[in-house]
Amino acid sequence: MNSNRISLNNLSLFFFMFVILGFMTTAGAVDEATNELPKEKQTSLGLYVTSAEAYDKWLAAPDDVKVLDVRTLEEYIYIGHAPMAWNIPLATQTHEWDADKGYFAYQPNPDFLSQVKEVAEPTDTIMVMCRSGGRSAMAVNLLAENGFTNVYQITDGVEGDKVKDSNSYFNGQRLVNGWKNSGSPWTYKVDPEKVKLTTADEAVAGKQ
């Protein structure tokens, strides 16, 4: 009788330690994954997926998962996009050259939050992408600051990270990862219902 009780106690202790170890391992894996991300891709919510994982997550529950593409309208149209993704730009392209940064400057989309709220609730599962993970991280943080709680950063974006191999013909090109390189579906075809025009875009459209 006593030996049985001891065995049960040992089993309970083993199970308890197994659960604790599993929790610590999972937490460690999350921390490790976060630490491997460049600072500019990290978010306050700490929820991360790759493009392939994001597509699988959407595919499992297409009515419950929202995918946001926060690139400019021009990128969305001419570089291609995930067919289920809403285009709600975090910022729009200007025609002002930034000599220090080496590209044309962006200006914030003042309607970003209100436009996201038109398609998603603060408790919805939302996955956000941009070109390669920088703007999407900023978008996730902005949403988190305004009450959204379940927003994932798609870490590799639409185009992915650059090849860093000076001996490669593809050095500097975005072919390492990303939605377009993952085998997930993408298209150039635009569904106007999934495009949220910014104030700047509407002004341009009104002149045409």
Model-derived regions: residue spans:
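Bacterial N-terminal signal peptides that target proteins for export
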Residues: 2-14
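Rhodanese-like catalytic fold shared by cysteine-dependent sulfurtransferases
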Residues: 7, 27-52, 57-63, 77-125, ...
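Bacterial N-terminal signal peptides
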Residues: 12-23
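Short hydrophobic beta-strand that contains or immediately precedes a catalytic carboxylate
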Residues: 66-71
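Short, surface-exposed ligand- or partner-binding patches at beta-edge/loop junctions that are enriched
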Residues: 128-130
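Conserved G/P- and acidic residue-centered "switch" motifs that form tight phosphate/ATP-binding loops
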Residues: 133
